[in-house]
């Protein structure tokens, strides 16, 4: 008879996500993970496989929760009714998150810096997250163009790539400074392309 699980898998995964997000992959030991997750090594390996597989699961969890750009943009668009305001809210959320999360940055961006370009399946997951961010921004920009919020001279695919790159750069900058006024200045200058 199989022994029942003695822990909440989702809660353990959330805890692992926070450890990896704070420390990165290389600096996180299995001991760090079992202590944070409140489980033993055998349970970790049985439930998640190895450290690499657990990292992939934690990164996916981040993308579906904290780092859900599509959801954040959709909610901001519904709340404000303005594509430009929704994009601004996304950028300002990155500034606010930096201050509220001990300057951890974005787990996806941190992973890109730690692993890429030769990161195999982890790199593929990072690339997918970046494409999803770009696609979400592209969709909002198309709505902005259709509603007349931005002009016809704007190329939505190119602008979505630019905004994705700028958002990721902002997330890196937010790790290096506690000067939120400077970060807001970066947002203002970046988003001036929408005017």
Predicted segment positions?
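Hydrophobic alpha-helical segments that form the core
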Residues: 104-110, 136, 152-173, 186-192
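All-alpha amphipathic helical-bundle segments outside canonical DNA-binding/catalytic cores
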Residues: 124-129, 146-162, 180-181, 185
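N-terminal intrinsically disordered/low-complexity leader segments
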Residues: 1-7
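Amphipathic C-terminal alpha-helical segment
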Residues: 97, 118, 139, 143, ...
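Helix-turn-helix
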Residues: 11, 15, 19-53, 57
């Amino acid at each position: 008879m199989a022994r029942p699980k003695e822990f909440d898998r989702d809660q353990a995964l959330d805890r692992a996500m926070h450890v990896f997000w704070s420390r990165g992959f290389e600096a996180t030991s299995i001991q760090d993970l079992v202590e944070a997750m409140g489980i033993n090594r055998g349970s970790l390996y049985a439930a998640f496989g190895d450290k690499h597989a657990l990292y992939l699961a934690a990164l996916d969890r981040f993308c579906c929760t904290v780092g859900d750009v599509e959801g954040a943009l959709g909610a901001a668009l519904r709340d404000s009714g303005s594509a430009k305001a929704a994009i601004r809210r996304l950028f300002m959320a990155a500034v606010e998150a930096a201050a509220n999360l001990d300057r951890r940055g974005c787990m996806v961006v941190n992973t890109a810096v730690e692993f890429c370009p030769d990161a195999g399946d982890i790199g593929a997951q990072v690339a997918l997250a970046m494409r999803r961010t770009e696609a979400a921004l592209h969709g909002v920009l198309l709505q902005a163009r259709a509603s007349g919020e931005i002009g016809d001279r704007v190329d939505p695919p190119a602008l979505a790539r630019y905004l994705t790159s700028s958002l990721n750069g902002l997330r890196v900058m937010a790790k290096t400074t506690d000067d939120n006024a400077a970060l807001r200045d970066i947002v203002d200058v970046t988003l001036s392309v929408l005017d």
